[in-house]
Amino acid sequence: MQKELLEVFDNRFPDRDYTIEIVNPEFTSVCPITGLPDFGTITIRYIPDKVCVELKSLKYYYLEFRNAGIFYENVTNTILDHLVDLLKPRTLTVTTAWKARGGITETVTVSYSAGQDE
């Protein structure tokens, strides 16, 4: 996944804590074992510091996963790592909720907080 696709814009309210929530209910990737498509909802919640993620660039970044063979846990952690590196937010949480496969669903959540050991 090319994190270079992600763009930012300046946060006009860097002295205020506020939460941004971004939801993509149409995320797709590919199971690395079966080669079958995986469908999920990606939710990003963060408190920005100096910059915010630009949504069109995030959309194109997500498309990079469409044909990638990658496990749910790797999707979730990769998105978190790339966004933390880019945004340097105060806090950031990524939750991926995957559609049922064989009657089983999975939700993966990973969080970052500025100042925590990485």
Swiss-Prot record:
One of its GO terms (biological process) is queuosine biosynthetic process. The keyword Repeat does not apply. The active site is at residues 31, 38. One of its GO terms (cellular component) is cytoplasm. Pfam families: QueF. InterPro entries: GTP-CH-I_C/QueF (IPR043133), NADPH_dep_7-cyano-7-deazaG_red (IPR050084), QueF (IPR029500), QueF_type1 (IPR016856). Keywords: Cytoplasm, NADP, Oxidoreductase, Queuosine biosynthesis. It is an enzyme of class 1 (oxidoreductase). Belongs to the GTP cyclohydrolase I family. QueF type 1 subfamily. This is NADPH-dependent 7-cyano-7-deazaguanine reductase. It comes from Chlorobium phaeobacteroides (strain BS1). The gene is queF.
